[in-house]
């Protein structure tokens, strides 16, 4: 592809509108899954708003444990952010992680839950109304977690 035809990934992010299923309140930044008839719902056991995928460690060794730095790809975003493992539990390559409060000026991560249902992207706005359309950023899709 000629260089002039290439676009930054943030310029070409695929946003789709999906209706929220009944009994779901979906906050902005929440990973979401496809439900019946093209609607979206909350993934099983994924409740925090910011999730990512453990991508790379400083020294290339896994698992990363408490205090280690890990680069994390944020779900639904092309962003890769440096985070520090906030617990003694090991984080493995490709694992879904929770990105939570600050620790020494950087974000903590803790091992996420097993990937019970696969998020398709991240909600771009908040919805509390059944059937309301919300944007879903499909920029980063997950494979299977560990």
Specify the residue positions occupied by each region the protein language model found.
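Glycine-anchored, exposed beta-strand/edge motif detector
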Residues: 1-146
């Amino acid at each position: 592809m000629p260089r002039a035809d290439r676009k930054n990934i943030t310029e070409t992010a695929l946003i789709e509108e999906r209706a929220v299923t009944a009994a779901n309140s979906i906050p902005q930044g929440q990973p979401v899954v496809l439900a019946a008839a093209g609607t979206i719902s909350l993934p099983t056991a994924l409740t925090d708003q910011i999730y990512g995928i453990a991508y790379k460690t400083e020294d290339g060794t896994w698992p990363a444990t408490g205090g280690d730095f890990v680069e994390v790809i944020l779900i639904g975003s092309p962003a890769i952010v440096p985070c520090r493992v906030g617990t003694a539990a090991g984080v493995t390559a490709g694992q879904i992680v929770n990105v939570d409060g600050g620790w020494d000026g950087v974000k903590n991560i803790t091992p996420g839950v097993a990937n019970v249902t696969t998020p398709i992207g991240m909600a771009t706005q908040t919805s509390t109304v059944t059937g309301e359309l919300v944007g879903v950023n499909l920029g980063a899709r997950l494979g299977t977690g560990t």
